[in-house]
């Protein structure tokens, strides 16, 4: 039996947690997630032309539907571009889940100049998020997604 990839586990976890729409911008580090989204008809994917738009679209979706909005962006400059929308959602107590890719594990925190590498991606978001997590292996995905959703539904998002 083939082993489930992290991308497949992520998409199935999002469906299980009730995510119906994902706003995002495809990129090399997250193409596996887009492939998994393509294979699962349970989530609608709306692509945009800038990561900031993805975050603002997730925010608007959350505010207009009362559901959690989800955005999918590339690491490094992608998550930094999304940070304005993330900060707006956080300041407004709007529930959005932002999923960012990451560079290859063998390049992580090595400062080698890998495409979209940022030494501490999570640190960039600490002042505009309630919860952040880093997932390194496929088995961690369901629990991490569940905890993120729990955080969004408990207290201030």
What kind of feature is each model-predicted range?
Residues 1-157:
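N-terminal alpha/beta PP-like core and its mobile active-site loop of ThDP/TPP-dependent enzymes
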């Amino acid at each position: 039996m083939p082993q489930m990839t992290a991308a497949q586990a992520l998409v199935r976890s999002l469906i299980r947690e009730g995510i119906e729409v994902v706003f995002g911008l495809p990129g090399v580090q997250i193409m596996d997630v887009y492939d998994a989204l393509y294979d699962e008809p349970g989530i609608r994917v709306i692509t945009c032309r800038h990561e900031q738009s993805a975050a603002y679209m997730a925010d608007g979706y959350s505010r207009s539907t009362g559901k959690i909005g989800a955005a999918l962006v590339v690491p490094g400059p992608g998550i930094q571009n999304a940070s304005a929308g993330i900060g707006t959602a956080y300041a407004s107590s709007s529930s959005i889940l932002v999923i960012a890719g990451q560079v290859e594990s063998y390049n992580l925190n090595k400062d080698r100049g890998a495409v979209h590498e940022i030494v501490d991606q999570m640190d960039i978001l600490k002042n505009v998020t309630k919860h952040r997590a880093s997932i390194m292996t496929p088995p961690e995905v369901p629990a991490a997604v569940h905890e993120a959703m729990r955080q969004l539904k408990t207290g201030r998002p």
